[in-house]
């Protein structure tokens, strides 16, 4: 070491402040309310700091400071407050925020809602410890999402394409196959790239660049086993990080599960250069946990008992999707929520729709006629689709085909409603053509197998097969140039 460096190190050693404060153990539990513990006479408590809790029987738990009032602190306990008393329970305020270990080795592993391994494997060797609230991102450094992430589901890829870095929720309801759809997207999700000479091919899921972070909140044991077994059997587990918060796990743990999952996704995306798809299910369970904490704190409730700050809280999760200038990776979010009583005006889907960039709507009527996946394309929307498709990204005719499918399907729905009133005999030949399209669209285009992965180009070709039911004059959303190139009636 050079003499100048030695001198500088000595100066720093002499001038460094070595004063530290020892951690104090408190036995001043003032009360317990639901998942919250009130601690009295705390010396300089800090908001959001981690608290180590030791019960009288020797078991340890962790909590986080939610509220500070002078020397009084309100702590939410992640593992629940059962067994905590004011005699034998000791608390230690660490002065640190809640962080989680992250590593590339987390791919292929299963963790609980607190980020601890539950697959019987070894503890992950951390490459970094990151705050679960995430790093603040300068809005000017965000990059507009402009590349498509392929799901293998025709109704999504063709009519509601998802851009890398987009946040788009899946609105479902009790009894609908949203878990099956989520598992299928995990199996089939991949990238689309351009081949030489301006022709497009399917990238076939570039394993080294694509990853999935799956966080389940409030699911039962059967659902958790289904996801785990499905990923392991089809080989997608190698590129998946699985976080499972079960229904019998502490409710309060659901508050941190999506944040731990997103922190892991941020590390994989911005440090490892991967394109990460984050699937969060069920956000309704998360919102219910938020309501439980709010009620325990005796806060003034908002709509249907949910806290008034739920919009802001949901935004802290959804807004962590995106791309950053100078970083190769991206985070695409697909949160899944079940609408209570199929009510899309419920506060959870209502506020989610304000924050996110569209929605995918799972329809009960389609499910009742055995259509899978039962995605209703009419209330479904992807606001960033226009920037993720077209020549050089998918195919030049993509936008026109999508618009024409929407137009014909909407007219077909109107004709079906009119048929129920006036009867089929009163319909014109053109109306009957739209009815035929309506049936074939739902049976052939919307409907596909659980393990049927269609590339975007297969789906576009299938769409053209349906559009050829109509004469060119009725395909008003497609330009004459595109019709001349793509419209070829089969002689059969």
From Swiss-Prot:
GO terms for biological process: ATP metabolic process; vacuolar acidification. One of its GO terms (molecular function) is ATP binding. Keywords: Hydrogen ion transport, Ion transport, Transport. The keyword Cell cycle does not apply. InterPro entries: ATP-synt_VA_C, ATPase_F1/V1/A1_a/bsu_N, ATPase_F1/V1/A1_a/bsu_nucl-bd, ATPase_V1-cplx_bsu, P-loop_NTPase, V-ATPase_su_B/beta. The keyword Protein transport does not apply. It holds the Pfam family ATP-synt_ab. One of its GO terms (cellular component) is proton-transporting V-type ATPase, V1 domain. Signal peptide: none annotated. Non-catalytic subunit of the peripheral V1 complex of vacuolar ATPase. V-ATPase is responsible for acidifying a variety of intracellular compartments in eukaryotic cells. V-ATPase is a heteromultimeric enzyme composed of a peripheral catalytic V1 complex (main components: subunits A, B, C, D, E, and F) attached to an integral membrane V0 proton pore complex (main component: the proteolipid protein). Belongs to the ATPase alpha/beta chains family. This is V-type proton ATPase subunit B 2. It comes from Acetabularia acetabulum.
């Amino acid at each position: 070491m050079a003499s100048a460096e030695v001198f500088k190190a000595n100066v720093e050693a002499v001038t460094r402040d070595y004063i530290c404060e020892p951690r104090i153990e408190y036995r001043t539990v003032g009360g317990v309310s639901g998942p919250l513990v009130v601690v009295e006479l705390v010396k300089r408590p800090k908001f959001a700091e981690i608290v180590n809790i030791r019960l009288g029987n020797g078991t340890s738990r962790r909590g986080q400071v939610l509220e500070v009032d002078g020397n009084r602190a309100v702590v939410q306990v992640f593992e629940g407050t059962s067994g905590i008393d004011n005699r034998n329970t000791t608390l230690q305020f660490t002065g640190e925020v809640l962080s989680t270990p992250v590593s590339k080795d987390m791919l292929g592993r299963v963790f609980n809602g607190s980020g601890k391994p539950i697959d019987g494997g070894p503890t992950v060797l951390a490459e970094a410890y990151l705050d679960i609230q995430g790093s603040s991102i300068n809005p000017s450094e965000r990059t507009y999402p402009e590349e498509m992430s392929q799901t293998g589901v025709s109704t999504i890829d063709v009519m509601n394409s998802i851009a890398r870095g987009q946040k788009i929720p899946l609105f479902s309801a009790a009894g609908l196959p949203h878990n099956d759809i989520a598992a299928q997207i995990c199996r089939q999700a991949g990238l689309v790239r351009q081949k030489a000479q301006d022709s497009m091919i399917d990238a076939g899921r570039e394993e080294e660049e694509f990853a999935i972070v799956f966080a389940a909140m409030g699911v039962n044991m059967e659902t958790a086993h289904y996801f785990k077994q499905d990923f392991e059997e089809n080989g997608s587990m190698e590129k998946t990080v699985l976080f499972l918060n079960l229904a019998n796990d502490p409710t309060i743990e659901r508050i941190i599960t999506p944040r731990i999952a997103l922190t892991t996704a941020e590390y994989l995306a911005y440090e490892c250069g991967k394109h990460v798809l984050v699937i969060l299910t069920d956000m309704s369970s998360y919102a219910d946990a938020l309501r439980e904490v709010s009620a325990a704190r005796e806060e003034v409730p908002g709509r249907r008992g949910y806290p008034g700050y739920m919009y802001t809280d949901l935004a802290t999760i959804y807004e962590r999707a995106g791309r950053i200038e100078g970083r190769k990776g991206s985070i695409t979010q697909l949160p899944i929520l079940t609408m209570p009583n199929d009510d899309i005006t419920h506060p959870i889907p209502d506020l989610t729709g304000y924050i996110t960039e569209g929605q995918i709507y799972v329809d009960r009527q389609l499910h009742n006629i055995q259509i899978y996946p039962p995605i209703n394309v009419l209330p479904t929307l992807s606001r960033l689709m226009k920037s993720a498709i077209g020549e050089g990204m998918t195919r030049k005719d993509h936008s026109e085909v999508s618009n024409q499918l929407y137009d014909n399907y909407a007219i077909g729905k109107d004709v079906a409603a009119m048929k129920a009133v006036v009867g089929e005999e009163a319909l014109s030949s053109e109306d009957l053509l739209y009815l035929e399209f309506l049936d074939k669209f739902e049976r052939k285009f919307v409907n596909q197998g659980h393990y049927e992965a269609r590339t975007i180009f297969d789906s576009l070709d299938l769409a053209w097969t349906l559009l050829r039911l109509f004469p060119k004059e009725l395909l008003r959303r497609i330009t004459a140039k595109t019709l001349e190139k793509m419209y070829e009636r089969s002689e059969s």
